Regions:
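Feature responds to low-complexity, polar/acidic, surface-exposed segments characteristic
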Residues: 2-4, 15-41, 56-72, 79-107, ...
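Sec-dependent signal peptide recognition
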Residues: 8-14
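Hydrophobic core segments within long, regular secondary-structure runs in both alpha-
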Residues: 43-46, 109-110, 173-177, 254, ...
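A short amphipathic alpha-helical interaction element
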Residues: 46-49, 74, 78, 112, ...
Length: 345
């Protein structure tokens, strides 16, 4: 309705060139695990976590990235790096009905309960350590363990972010929201976030590694790349009049840009990228208003997008190309809305 394929290609190319400034060099590493060659998606995560003593492999020299992880194993992965081993060894009992003296995971579970990483009685009477750990559970526990405050951080953003993370009152919503902003996860090829998916060792390694890198200020490039990917999705969806997909993507793109800004608030390219993400969010809202025949709102939101794009190139002049394209799209939306307002219904 408002966006052409030619404009979409120009926007994405400009953004890709701009965020390339944040490319982080990759150094060659020797593989520690027989089943994780250097080109495996989990390679870098496993090597880093092994170097920090957080995750180890098996006696046969493998990592087994596809092996499922239960809740007890997940708690150990999360708790072991932050609670000293002596304290864990001193634990002799737990109020959980299914955690007994002699269980290898007793100390880790009790340390997690005492530190607010997991809920205990009376809210939860059983730990269910043998159950597979689900993605949202692992993400929540990891955030709690690191005092991330996901219920407060970015709480002003109350937007559906995927078809399976669309209800703002779902218990896992704030944790998945912060997971996107901290580069812990992103959508898959199916456009979903899969909060209820059982995790493997490889999954846990990736999520943990990404979060530790984010805390260390080393995921800015990844977050800006994710914001770029969401812009591609937005414009492709709008070409197909798929407004829901565009809305999900605009929310995720905004979260990714906000996450980068939380990490590197003084970087001009990050400041400009945030304004760009905000501009695309305004464009999507304008498109929705157009579908609802709220043409006054279209012109207002298109104007907002125009102004945000102007601010983006002021902050980061190398974003001029994408900012100009946003303004071209904004003008087209506003002009179309004005024409429709003057057309007899």
């Amino acid at each position: 309705m408002y966006v052409s394929l030619q404009k979409r290609q120009a926007v994405c190319t400009a953004f890709a060139l701009s965020i390339g400034l944040f490319t982080i060099p990759v150094h060659a590493q020797t593989a520690s695990f027989k089943d994780l060659p250097a080109d495996h998606p989990v390679f870098a995560a496993a090597e880093y976590l092994k170097s920090k003593g957080i995750i180890s492999g098996y006696s046969d020299g493998t990592f087994k990235p596809d092996k499922g992880v239960n809740r007890a194993e997940a708690i150990k992965i999360i708790v072991a790096p932050i609670i000293d081993a002596a304290s864990i060894a001193q634990v002799t009992s737990s109020p959980f009905t299914d955690v007994k003296q002699g269980d290898w995971f007793l100390g880790y579970v009790e340390a997690a309960r005492q530190n607010g990483i997991i809920d205990g009685p009376p809210k939860k009477t059983a730990f269910n350590g043998g159950n597979p750990v689900l993605k949202a559970e692992f993400i929540k526990m990891l955030q709690q363990a690191n005092n991330a405050k996901p219920l407060e951080t970015l709480s002003e953003i109350q937007l559906p972010i995927a078809p399976d993370v669309a209800k703002l009152d779902d218990w896992f919503y704030p944790y998945m929201r912060y997971a996107i902003a901290s580069s812990m996860t992103m959508i898959g090829a199916d456009g979903l976030l899969h909060p209820d998916r059982p995790l493997t060792r490889g999954d846990c390694a990736l999520i943990l590694h990404r979060y530790l890198m984010y805390k260390d200020g080393r995921r800015t490039q990844a977050l800006l790349s994710e914001a770029e990917s969401e812009i591609i999705i937005i414009l492709g969806a709008l070409e197909k009049n798929d407004i829901m997909t565009a809305e999900f993507a605009s929310a995720r793109g905004l979260l990714a840009a906000r996450g980068a800004h939380l990490s590197k608030p003084d970087e001009p390219i990050v400041q400009g990228a945030l304004k760009t993400a905000e501009a695309f969010r305004a464009l999507v809202r304008a498109y929705r208003a157009g579908l609802n025949k709220q043409y006054d709102e279209v012109t207002k939101l298109a104007g907002d997008a125009w102004n945000l794009a102007s601010r983006a190139k002021e902050l980061a002049p190398n974003l001029a190309a994408i900012s100009d394209q946003v303004q071209t799209i904004s003008k087209g939306m506003a002009d179309s809305a004005r024409t429709l307002m003057q057309t007899p219904q």
